[in-house]
Curated annotation (Swiss-Prot):
GO terms for cellular component: chloroplast. It holds the Pfam family Oxidored_nitro. Belongs to the BchN/ChlN family. The gene is chlN. This is Light-independent protochlorophyllide reductase subunit N. Keywords: 4Fe-4S, ATP-binding, Chlorophyll biosynthesis, Chloroplast, Iron, Iron-sulfur, Metal-binding, Nucleotide-binding, Oxidoreductase, Photosynthesis, Plastid.
Length: 467
């Protein structure tokens, strides 16, 4: 199946299986980002094994997430789901006293039709802690969409935006805003609506990034006279940004299309469709688009980008002319491919589990522009790739590097194809100007390893038995 969206950009759609992590893995980074939260995954033993093995947290670390394990009595409706969840949440409140409890639904809760959304409001009122329900189950296309589901659920809990020209609030304003957080002890400055004192409308960025990276992006925008009003998610649940008509929002990750839709439809926010700030070229385009929307002239971005490229020259010498093949895993493929093409690499194919063409429209345009600038043909973009067909194409093309999910890495290595786990790009700091070096460090590691082995005369990693 082919779908042509422009004169030169063509998508292919196959019917392959999704060999990817489960979306409940979003707990791994979200519980660290939202510091006053507690994540309760409602699922089976399989979910528990996955969390324990994938996250690898020591038992003494006492992480702020737990597993509510479904047993036969739950599935056969012999036990009262509400009473069981109430018992667990009371225990969580006693031990941790979080500002919010996030229930993560799984495949099993979908199959047995467990009414988590119906139970949450009643239990929330009973125990006095907000409960957010997110169905981050394995029915999604990619594991990164678990974060998308959680953020979309949190959007509904954000206070409504009120345009005010003065910072003082009346008692009525405070009382109205406090109803949304009636279970929390909020200070007056926590529930203050965004004040219209800036030269531009309020801007809220959405996407979970490490605090250092989000601070860097805030600083880059501040250099261009743009103040960020808030982030989603915030480090503390009690500091959620105000959202509503007149608030502009912009995403930092390509897998947050559900959150973007919720912000536009439910909160009436205005979405800034921009390329994602991955790589110096993407970060510059991201800032320029935001400045353009606010009618602000950006300053010094070209010099800033050129300086970063100059600092990457030692890595660029290693990747220039090398070929790469994306098998598709985490929805970061388009942004990473665009950056690597700009670095001088040849991208044979971009496999991607799912493509929201509206949300990624600006990124696709930048990909096309980058290919024209580097004078290279546009790569194949294959949605829902069939892994068997991909293996045949990899055999024919013989790329220098395949960026793939963990399931295919070892089999490809055994066939002489160098690989890099795509999940590493999910957990690495890849956003902003200064983190472009980290992307190239990941990409060049297998290439440098091969070069070192070749110098030692070790041309094969797989031992071949002599006849």
């Amino acid at each position: 199946m082919l779908e042509k969206i422009s004169d030169t950009l063509t998508f292919e759609c196959e019917t392959g299986n999704y060999h990817t992590f489960c979306p409940i893995s979003c707990v791994a980074w979200l519980y660290q980002k939202i510091e006053d939260s507690f994540f309760l995954v409602v699922g089976t033993k399989t979910c528990g094994y996955f969390l324990q093995n994938a996250l690898g947290v020591m038992i003494f670390a006492e992480p702020r997430y737990a597993m509510a394990e479904l047993e036969e009595g739950d599935i056969s409706a012999q036990l009262n789901d509400y009473e069981e969840l109430k018992r667990l949440c009371i225990q969580i409140k006693k031990d941790r006293n979080p500002s919010v409890i996030v229930w993560i639904g799984t495949c099993t809760t979908e199959i047995i039709k467990m009414d988590l959304e119906g139970m949450a409001p009643k239990l929330e009122a009973e125990i006095g802690i907000p409960i957010v329900v997110a169905r981050a189950n394995g029915l999604d296309y990619a594991f990164t969409q678990g974060e998308d589901t959680v953020l979309a659920a949190i959007v509904h809990r954000c206070p409504d935006y009120k345009l005010q020209n003065k910072t003082d609030l009346t008692d009525n304003d405070i009382q109205e805003d406090a109803t949304r957080f009636s279970f929390l002890k909020l200070r007056k400055n926590n529930i203050r609506s965004i004040s219209a004192t800036n030269s531009h409308p309020p801007l809220v960025l959405f996407g979970s990034l490490p605090t250092t990276v989000s601070s860097q992006l805030n600083l880059e925008l501040k250099r261009n006279q743009i103040e960020v009003s808030g982030w989603l998610p915030t480090q503390r649940y009690t500091d959620l940004p105000s959202l509503g008509e007149g608030v502009y929002v912009c995403g930092v990750n390509p897998f947050l299309s559900r959150t973007a839709t919720t912000l536009m439809r439910r909160k009436k926010c205005k979405l800034i469709s921009a390329p994602f700030p991955i790589g110096p070229d993407g970060t510059r385009a991201w800032i320029e688009k935001i400045c353009n929307v606010f009618n602000i002239q950006p300053t010094g971005l070209e010099e800033r980008e050129n300086k970063i490229w100059d600092g990457l020259e030692d890595y660029l010498d290693l990747v220039r002319g090398k070929s790469v093949f994306f098998m598709g895993d985490n929805l970061l493929e388009i942004s990473l491919a665009r950056f690597l093409i700009r670095c001088g690499m040849i991208v044979y194919e971009i496999g991607i589990p799912y493509m929201d063409k509206r949300y990624q429209a600006a990124e696709l345009m930048l990909l096309q522009k980058t290919c024209e600038m580097m004078n290279v043909p546009l790569p194949r973009i294959v949605e829902k790739p069939d892994n068997y067909n991909q293996i045949q194409r990899i055999r024919e093309l013989k790329p220098d590097l395949a960026i793939t999910g963990m399931a295919h890495a070892n089999p490809l290595e055994a066939r002489g194809i160098s690989t890099k786990w795509s999940v590493e790009f999910t957990f690495a700091q890849i956003h902003g100007f200064t983190n472009a070096r980290d992307i190239l460090e990941l990409v060049t590691r297998p290439l440098r390893r091969n070069q070192s082995l070749h110098e030692l005369g070790w041309n094969n990693l797989v031992k071949v038995n002599s006849q």
